[in-house]
Swiss-Prot record:
SMART domains: HTH_ARAC. Disruption phenotype: Cells lacking this gene exhibit reduced survival both in macrophages and in a mouse infection model. Pfam families: DJ-1_PfpI, HTH_18. Residues 176-197, 224-247 bind DNA. Residues 104-170 are annotated as: Disordered. One of its GO terms (biological process) is regulation of DNA-templated transcription. Transmembrane segments: none annotated. Residues 174-257 form the HTH araC/xylS-type domain. It comes from Mycobacterium tuberculosis (strain ATCC 25618 / H37Rv). One of its GO terms (molecular function) is DNA-binding transcription factor activity. Controls the expression of genes important for virulence. This is HTH-type transcriptional regulator Rv1931c. Residues 104-121 have a biased composition (Basic residues). Keywords: DNA-binding, Transcription, Transcription regulation, Virulence.
């Protein structure tokens, strides 16, 4: 690891990426000292996936609520509290539990810093839109263009919200129906699904519905009631409770911040 130097002026945003090299990076005292020094004067610190471990090693988190990091959150505890999928534009420290969530932060951080009225696309080498759907990280997930994932490897175990079902997030995806579709008993289906995805089917469905509702809040002028019905929540109150659990703010607050 080579430390080029310290910036002459305070930086606005420090981004700590994750990946396979995080464990080695955490053992580099010079790097950790650099992160501490630069983050101390930055307006915000953003971590992507296991980059949160760098922030933890540098002592930046304290009791900050942090995202799940795909099941690795338990290693933070007890010093750092963990909650999955929270989006807090007002926090100094921002967390992204994976690469896809990191793209979401990439989109929202410039808007939070310079105002809401920003284009939904930016010039970048891969031409990526700033508005990007979030998918699960396993065979249950959508194939991602350019990721090397072969769409033909998708199986009959695909849950609602993944692959061809993503457009039907509002369907009645009950455990019994999903298990029957996968030719499994409900108990076995729940166990296999949880092992591969890292969360129970019911929580996965709620997450997919929440992501679908987030996109509609950002991209349409439909009412919260209409979006809740379309995304499978049934009522606006059910959708509000889901947003509070997963996003940390209500649908109305989310729309005001990101639409």
């Amino acid at each position: 690891m080579v430390i080029v130097g310290f910036p002459g002026d305070p930086v606005d945003t420090v981004i700590l990426p994750g990946g396979a090299g995080v464990d080695a990076a955490r053992s580099e005292p010079a790097l950790i000292d650099w992160v501490k020094a630069v983050s101390g004067t930055a307006r915000r610190v953003v971590t992507v996936c296991t980059g949160a471990f760098l922030a933890a090693e540098a002592g930046l988190l304290g009791r900050t609520p942090s995202d799940d990091a795909l099941g690795l959150c338990r290693t933070f505890r007890p010093r750092i509290s963990g909650r999955s999928g929270r989006c807090r534009p007002d926090l100094h420290a921002q967390f992204a539990e994976g690469v896809d969530r990191g793209w979401s932060h990439r989109r929202h951080r410039p808007r939070a810093g310079t105002g809401r009225r920003r284009p939904r696309h930016r010039d970048c080498p891969d031409g990526c839109p700033l508005a990007r759907p979030v998918s699960a990280p396993t065979r249950w997930a959508d194939p991602v263009r350019g990721s090397g994932v072969d769409a033909t490897r998708q199986t009959d175990l695909d849950p609602p919200g993944a692959g061809g079902h993503r457009g039907r997030a509002g369907g009645a995806h009950r455990i019994g129906e999903l298990a029957q579709r996968a030719a499994m008993s409900p108990r076995h289906f729940t166990r296999v699904f949880s092992d591969e995805v890292g969360e129970a089917p019911g929580r996965y469905v709620e997450r997919i519905r929440t992501e679908a509702a987030r996109r509609q809040l950002e991209e349409t002028h439909d009412t919260v009631v209409a979006i809740a019905a379309r995304c499978g929540f049934g009522t606006a109150e059910t959708m509000r409770r889901s947003f509070i659990r997963r996003v940390g703010i209500s649908p109305d607050q989310y729309r005001k911040a990101f639409a």
